[in-house]
């Protein structure tokens, strides 16, 4: 077991009841193009087309052969594009239950599948996009070979779902998915299954699966943390990672021949009336999913964690491909008298400069950052929440200044935006380090 000490479990109110309920019915789903780093689509459909579940919507021009499929059957009602014609979302009005079928196998055949059989089924169904690479967090090329594959079966994000609750309903599907993954490279690559201590995660002694437990505060449950401690990456070495619900979907694909797009997400946060786990589907319209669920007032719905999720509004008002939670907090627009110096008891700070830092209560966090952006202040805040073996203050300084050579030497290739979310949260200068990291990674990938 690997135990980390640095980190922070955010004391936010609205923790979900760990019981799965059926969510609101949604009649719109979407594929969000901007989730896929560096992807340039070649569209295979247009507005007004009727598509089946599992039908190809577009292909990545820059990653030949990688296709993105419809999460539900229905009519294409919108193809939204932003600046420079960047694909924002492909929206489907859900109608009917027609679907494309794929190769299916008996459970007893899974352990003898060839790498080509596994890859072909994953690619054709669109489930290849469940994989992401580290470094760069991109969908891998079809001819890429990772050092290993990481399956994340734990979650320490604020307000997260307990994976064990979901896996209890799909034990055999999860084991089938692990078996399929173990055959992706003919059994030559280790599958690292990362879980919480004492969790009852099924493995059924699948070949090439190595189980590692992680303990400690967030970010103990992030894939970036797991990769750093088990099989760290570099500019010449990569690994792939995916979450446990996609492993379930892979297991179901190979045993049923059908694309499984159900998702169990936590619907939680200070502004949710009844925080709980809800069953919905990939790409669900979040306005419909949260209808009647939220407290009065101006709320921000987030696809993903409050620390690193995406604001769900307008053309982005849908559950993301990699999101396992929907978080809701209030928009913090109120001005507070003497807000910088009053020792409030209803506020939280890692620096213990407010009375609330000394209590163990949960706080109704809002979107307010309590100050304007300013220079970095190196007072040890970053070191308190960064468990990885890097120098966070120096790394963040280099990211802010655009010095990619130094940032690469300090370990930025190991990171994804979510790995710096706590640094952003505790930053006295109110800096957002996620876009700085992405700009650095893009530059390194392009220029070396």
Swiss-Prot record:
First-level EC class: translocase
Pfam families cross-referenced by the UniProt entry: NQRA_2nd (PF24836), NQRA_N (PF05896), NQRA_SLBB (PF11973)
Record InterPro entries: NqrA (IPR008703), NQRA_2nd (IPR056148), NqrA_C_domain (IPR022615), NQRA_N (IPR056147)
Catalysed reaction equations from the record: a ubiquinone + n Na(+)(in) + NADH + H(+) = a ubiquinol + n Na(+)(out) + NAD(+)
N-terminal signal peptide: none
Single GO biological process annotation from the record: sodium ion transport
EC number: 7.2.1.1
UniProt keyword Signal, yes or no: no
Keywords, alphabetical: Ion transport, NAD, Sodium, Sodium transport, Translocase, Transport, Ubiquinone
Gene Ontology MF term list: oxidoreductase activity, acting on NAD(P)H, quinone or similar compound as acceptor
Family: Belongs to the NqrA family.
Complex formation: Composed of six subunits; NqrA, NqrB, NqrC, NqrD, NqrE and NqrF.
Biological function: NQR complex catalyzes the reduction of ubiquinone-1 to ubiquinol by two successive reactions, coupled with the transport of Na(+) ions from the cytoplasm to the periplasm. NqrA to NqrE are probably involved in the second step, the conversion of ubisemiquinone to ubiquinol.
Name of this chain's protein: Na(+)-translocating NADH-quinone reductase subunit A
Organism per entry: Glaesserella parasuis serovar 5 (strain SH0165)
């Amino acid at each position: 077991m690997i135990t980390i000490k640095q980190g922070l479990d955010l004391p936010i109110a609205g923790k979900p009841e760990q019981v799965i309920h059926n969510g609101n019915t949604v009649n719109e789903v979407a594929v969000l193009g901007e989730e896929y780093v560096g992807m340039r689509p070649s569209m295979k459909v247009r507005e007004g087309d009727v598509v089946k579940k599992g039908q190809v919507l577009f292909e990545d021009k820059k990653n030949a052969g990688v296709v993105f499929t419809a999460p539900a059957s229905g009519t294409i009602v919108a193809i939204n594009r932003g600046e420079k014609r960047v694909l924002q979302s492909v929206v489907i009005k859900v109608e009917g239950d027609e679907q494309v079928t794929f190769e299916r196998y008996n459970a007893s055949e899974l352990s003898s599948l060839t790498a080509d059989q596994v890859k072909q089924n994953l690619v054709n169904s669109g489930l290849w996009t469940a994989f992401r690479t580290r470094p760069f967090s991109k969908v891998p090329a079809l001819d890429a070979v990772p050092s290993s594959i990481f399956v994340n079966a734990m979650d320490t994000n604020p307000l997260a779902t307990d994976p064990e609750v979901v896996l209890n309903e799909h034990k055999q599907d999860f084991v089938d998915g692990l078996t399929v993954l173990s055959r992706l490279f003919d059994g030559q690559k280790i599958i690292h299954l990362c879980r919480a201590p004492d969790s009852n995660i099924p493995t059924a002694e699948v070949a090439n699966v190595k189980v590692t437990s992680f303990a400690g505060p967030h970010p103990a449950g992030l894939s970036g943390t797991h990769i750093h401690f088990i099989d760290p990456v570099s500019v010449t070495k990569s690994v792939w990672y995916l979450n446990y619900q996609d492993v379930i979907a892979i297991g179901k694909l190979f045993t049923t021949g059908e694309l499984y797009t159900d998702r169990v997400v936590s619907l939680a946060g200070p502004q949710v009336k009844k925080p709980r786990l809800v069953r919905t589907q990939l790409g669900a319209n979040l306005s419909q999913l949260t209808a009647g669920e939220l407290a009065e007032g101006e709320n921000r719905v987030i696809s993903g964690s409050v620390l690193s999720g995406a604001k769900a509004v307008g053309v982005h008002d849908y559950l993301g491909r990699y999101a396992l939670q929907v978080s809701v907090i209030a928009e913090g627009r109120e001005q507070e008298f003497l807000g910088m110096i009053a020792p409030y008891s209803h506020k939280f700070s890692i620096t213990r400069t407010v009375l609330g830092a000394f209590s163990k209560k949960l706080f109704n966090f809002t979107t307010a950052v309590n100050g304007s952006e300013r220079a970095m202040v190196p007072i040890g805040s970053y070191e308190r929440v960064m468990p990885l073996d890097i120098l966070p203050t120096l790394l963040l300084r280099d990211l802010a200044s655009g010095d990619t050579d130094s940032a690469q030497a300090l370990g930025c290739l190991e990171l994804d935006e979510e790995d710096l979310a706590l640094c952003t949260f505790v930053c006295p200068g109110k800096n957002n380090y996620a876009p700085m990291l992405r700009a650095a990674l893009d530059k390194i990938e392009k220029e070396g």
